[in-house]
């Protein structure tokens, strides 16, 4: 009799634990900050792909920058981790007595990393040195950058307030300095106008209308407005008061023209005169080539630093014109349901993107087995990378968390891997859309949910 009593007691405890697990986890999505939100959650064990927890896992929601997990993983799948881009430079005509009777011609290879702050390349200075070593003192023709007129289209679902700011830099055949320029502003007392100290690099043909004022707020709340063909860009908003120099970054919509101006300036400093008398279309000789970092290195910064430009480059690598179609085909090819996907860009900036949490988690389970460190190393690390500081503040999480964040107005998203106390590795995706509470509280709720997962 005593045996049966103990048996029934143990059975009740086990059943109680099993029944409570989803109920306990569900309570996180019933808190005040989540009351009006649309929430999708998917958690699976990477070892066998079995479901650990689901909550609206099939609901299509805005992923923000979590979309980069698709761009990076599929680029690695299709192109391998060692692919590189090549930029070639030629001179046309003949060099006689220091005079180049022709042009300098740059053949872009789609490299998104030329003189990027994320890599040490020195493309501009190395090209200038190569021209000088040829003994050129004068260039009769021009500097020609091929495909310069191929202006990329802005996705129609990008917000107007984003388009002129650095994180909306478009991917071009020729890219330079992350297609970003920096406006340094000086501020005075709160409420007073600011002034432009410098623009680096200078942007030919574009004027700035500065309407930014000084503020007691200690944050960057200044925005740039204007499309790619605008001759005048407006700057509005506020920056902290009493700053001698405060940086506001904009999207460089015509990187080829900016680079040409920089190259001409540097050549002049070296005593090389660009005469621009005529374009001489003759045979050309390659004299300088730049190879980009490996694809896995570009993927690393795409996810670690959430670089939209790099993500758009990877999207073009996957498919120059049909990224969404290719994503669906590749996911279906590896057995992942793609029916709930809507994709309007490759970086996650579009407010029209929609993904089911379950689809992204399935991709993570697949990537863990097939892509290895080239993909896994690109994910932000808890306790190390600044983007995860809220999520990994808990000691239970910390280094046990590797995940990509996503955020835009009304959206908080997180997707990656979690190592549990049991020694298991879980792949998870959490999308929270249209919340009305404090975004930090939303992130803290996600953190507490992950903590509960980790200790069960």
Name these PLM-found stretches:
Residues 18-60, 81, 86, 121, ...:
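Beta-lactamase-like hydrolase cores
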Residues 49, 66-75, 143, 174, ...:
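Residue-level preference for non-acidic, small/hydrophobic
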Residues 1-24:
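Bacterial Sec-dependent N-terminal signal peptides
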Residues 54-70, 74, 78, 299:
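Short active-site loop at a secondary-structure junction
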